[in-house]
Amino acid sequence: MSVWQQGATIELRIDSLSHTGEGVGRWQDRVVFVADTVPGDRLRVRLTHVKRQYAHGKVLEVVQPSGQRVRPNCIVADKCGGCQWQRVAYATQLAAKEQLVKDAIARIGHLEPQAFLPILAAPNPFGYRNKVTYPLGRRHGAVVAGYYQKGSHHLVNLNQCPVQDPRLNPLLAALKQALQPWPIYREQTHEPGFRHLGLRIGQRTGEQLITLVLAGPLPAGLAAEAEGWLQRFQGVIGVCVNFNHHVGNRIFGDETQVLAGRPYLWEEMAGVRFQIASTTFFQVNTAQAEQLVTTLRDWIAPTGQERLVDLYCGVGTLSLPLAGAVAEVIGVEVHSASVQQAIANAQHNGINNAHFVCAKAEEWLPRYDQAVDVLILDPPRKGCDRAVLDAILHNCPPRLLYVSCHPATLARDLAHLCSTGTYQLAKIQPLDMFPQTAHVETIALLTTS
């Protein structure tokens, strides 16, 4: 039997980590990706998917563990697909993320920044998530909530999670019991019921918001049940239901209704008090969001005279903490509910120089004819629409700060922005927003040449 085929067993050493979180090793000049491994591990591996020059494998035996291998904090780390790197020492995670950003900028963007700064570590590598959304199911009659097993749609049942704020752990366990009499959605038959449980916490305020995602009509008596939860669970200030009748992987639908209490919680970040609803985008790591804002402020070095435009502004997460240092802020966001919350947040904090527009960035920016001193981009993972990048090159603000959660799309967009010679890549700053996972946040500063 040829060794390079599915089912064959090989021995190799893991040298690095990939952007998907897998360990990367080499065997006879071919690349092998192996999940749940650590750089420095020597392994015996069974090949599971084989191509000509690369393969994926499964660990059969850790022949010699790496010195960078640690015991996972999670008892289901070998099954749960939520985290990829709980076996990897935190310093090694940071080095790997830094390298992932460097590789993307060089190989995809073909760029070399004037300064590549060391990654900003998270002060708390565990217990940092202020928001979690768990798929729901029923197994042997009992409600289960958790994340999907790696590479499957089998739910790994959780009563706690080491990366979420620890104050959410008892709430998760209690709500699974409280949901026992209520209908649970069946993915195979699309039988109506609750399909996701969303928990959110203001890490600085302690306020907690429960969101049930429902496929089907609102069950009778649910509002009364929700009122009881407000009394029963300390810190819970609201219970909402989101209606999602779509078949597929979409978590939230378009309609959210408050069942009890408030439809939002308050959070404090970078000196600003934010109103955050169940489906609103807000950085999941409050402490690292503050580091992000601090870095942006330092790089802008405001004089108080600037006009700052924030594209993909959400609820004003970046705009509002920066507003006090500049003359004017304009935030642009396509989701109307987020725009309304951004306006409410500005009013609540007495910020009068921030204005928010509900529009697509690619449609608004080409029409905007005023001079922009500083432009902030914080797009979704897919990056910016080409029309946005072309409008930036036409408007040509002297300072452009791009915040990205995906190094590959960041590198692609930076390459386009620098392709005409208008901009140069001045700085790159990786930031660890998502410890224990392969995801990395990056800030890029472009200045006019």
From Swiss-Prot:
Binding, S-adenosyl-L-methionine: Q283, Y312, E333, D378
Enzyme class per UniProt: transferase
Active site per the UniProt annotation: C405 (nucleophile)
Residues given in the record as [4Fe-4S] cluster binding sites: C74, C80, C83, C161
Gene3D superfamilies: 2.40.50.1070, Nucleic acid-binding proteins (2.40.50.140), Vaccinia Virus protein VP39 (3.40.50.150)
A molecular function (GO) term: 4 iron, 4 sulfur cluster binding
A GO biological-process term: rRNA base methylation
Annotated SUPFAM superfamilies: Nucleic acid-binding proteins, S-adenosyl-L-methionine-dependent methyltransferases
Coiled coil start-end: none
Annotated Pfam families: TRAM (PF01938), tRNA_U5-meth_tr (PF05958)
Keyword set includes Iron: yes
Domain (TRAM): residue spans on this chain: 3-61
InterPro entries linked: MeTrfase_TrmA_AS, MeTrfase_TrmA_CS, NA-bd_OB-fold, SAM-dependent_MTases_sf, TRAM_dom, U5_MeTrfase_fam
EC code(s) of this entry: 2.1.1.-
Keywords: 4Fe-4S, Iron, Iron-sulfur, Metal-binding, Methyltransferase, S-adenosyl-L-methionine, Transferase
UniProt similarity note: Belongs to the class I-like SAM-binding methyltransferase superfamily. RNA M5U methyltransferase family.
Stated name of the protein: Uncharacterized RNA methyltransferase tlr0942
Provenance organism: Thermosynechococcus vestitus (strain NIES-2133 / IAM M-273 / BP-1)
